[in-house]
Amino acid sequence: MALLQISEPGLSAAPHQRRLAVGIDLGTTHSLVATVRSGEAQTLVDSDGRDLLPSVVHYRRDGHSVGWQARDNAARDPENTVSSVKRLMGRSLDDIQQRYPHLPYRFHASDNGLPLIQTPAGNLNPIQVSADILSALAARAEAALGGVPDGVVITVPAYFDDAQRQGTKDAARLAGLHVLRLLNEPTAAAIAYGLDSGKEGVIAIYDLGGGTFDISILRLSRGVFEVLATGGDSALGGDDFDHLLAEWLREQAGIHDRDDRQLDHALRAAAVKAKIALSSAESASVSIAGWQGDITREQFDSLIAPLVKRTLLSCRRTLKDAGLTPEEVLEVVMVGGSTRVPLVREQVGTFFGRTPLTSIDPDKVVAMGAAIQADILVGNKPDSDMLLLDVIPLSLGLETMGGLVEKIIPRNTTIPVARAQEFTTFKDGQSGMMIHVLQGEREMVADCRSLARFSLRGLPPLPAGGAHIRVTFQVDADGLLSVTAMEKSTGVEASIQVKPSYGLSDTEIATMITDSMLNAKEDVGARRLAEQKVEAARVLESLQSALVADAELLSNDEKGVIVAASEHLHTMMQGSDPVAIEAAIKTVDQQTQEFAARRMDASIRRALAGHSVDEV
């Protein structure tokens, strides 16, 4: 008899055959690909021995180039050379034009408002451009490993929203890659350092790359990586250092023409060269457009000091979220090429009161961590007991009556996670329910971010409160949110996967959290008022139905007293005093207790009509 060959999910049927896995750091400025060889993570290089691949694509009518060659074409053909495309991922055209007004590209809007970049190769969206970068990294990996990778882990900024994460997955699919999972960049760095150094305790991951800044506070203990809190700014990075320095050079050189894009690129290139030189020297010489001069490290520091201060403010907020002080942080890990700037290392060290860790190349550490995770996920390390816990940045919830927000999953909850809560109908015979999904920390819908709406229809026509709807929020390991609503008695179900069309910056997230703290007292008052108004409306709705059905159980005087109490409650509902509304509700309750008892007796008599005592 033939035997079925069964292997564990994710493992090769041949137990001694290693599967090919890579980690990709899809960066704003540069990208890398890494793998695990002989138990050690290492980056894969190109034919010239270079680890870094510039995240730049140059488009021609007959094709495109990626990386170093594309970057060299940027000065000659800036309109058709796309760089920092990561900043455009998941954003609308309006959003991009507001955030990045100086981009040299020619944009068009697609039918749904998403950006299309006009190139000789056609109109391309950011996902397609990212796919070209990923294809180049995949080709490098295939050449180095001698085969197509079985799986890949791709890193993304901690605050990428659902649309940006989904866009990254779509780009990988276009590039022919099998994505095992997306991994937050700071978390990838924690994996690399956790395995290499074996540290246990609280660690801060300070990640300042070309286009984004992330700060993550993690607790490492016996192989468990738990993200306690995250923060940052998705519109702040080394590119901004370059921009400030380029503007300084423009002023020094007396360059007033802002329409010459080749000159703009030359200014940016000179700024980058000077920045790199100032990381190891006290001054740097610059030659641009016939002007020659020097810039000192002190001058450069004064230019970028406000930006560095912004990163430290994010650090302070994130530590507060984690309930920690800088003194409780055991180590500070520096990630991203921009952390080579001496002022950054100095200021971060001063803030945390300790010298930051830089033993792993800050450009490579994220890709190496991703490679380690990929190696585990394809089954090359089945005995690994490492557990990775990410968190969601803002609370998720839904709208309830009165414009209130019911939080289902609080912010900084570890993911993946699923939470469910039961709700009911407000009116008699209600056959549908609108589910409004929200994100934020405030108490009222108007103060939170709307993520999605969907309808649950086909509810059984029961009295108010009779139908029971179970709403489940599920956030997967990649941070994508699915919401399902199901009526329990009928099994009627509706669901949605939340994919916002706009990116949410870390600054906006920090503002939302700060606003919730500043307005906490007012929000509690507003919630109490709204809750009392909802309860008052429910009481009046129920009373009106009772009067229509059983008014004959009351004398005219009794009915007059109840009507007067209900009218008083209706008047109080129009005001803004929750105490007065609550008192009016109690008055209605007191005046209707006898009526409720008579209705109960009448209901029992109707139920027993035509039945003998023995039958009962």
From Swiss-Prot:
Is Plastid included in the keywords of this UniProt record? no
Q: Which InterPro entries match?
A: ATPase_NBD, Heat_shock_70_CS, HscA_NBD, HSP70_C_sf, HSP70_peptide-bd_sf, Hsp_70_fam, ISC_FeS_clus_asmbl_HscA
Q: Which is an annotated GO molecular function term of this record?
A: unfolded protein binding
One BP term from GO: iron-sulfur cluster assembly
Keyword terms, alphabetized: ATP-binding, Chaperone, Nucleotide-binding
Gene3D superfamilies registered for this protein in UniProt:
1.20.1270.10, 3.30.420.40, Actin, Chain A, domain 4, Substrate Binding Domain Of DNAk, Chain A, domain 1
| Organism superkingdom | Bacteria
Quick check: keyword Signal in the entry?
no
Say what the protein does. Chaperone involved in the maturation of iron-sulfur cluster-containing proteins. Has a low intrinsic ATPase activity which is markedly stimulated by HscB. Involved in the maturation of IscU.
- Any Pfam family matching the protein: HSP70
| Protein name stated in the entry | Chaperone protein HscA
According to its UniProt entry, this protein's organism is Pectobacterium carotovorum subsp. carotovorum (strain PC1)
Similarity annotation: Belongs to the heat shock protein 70 family.
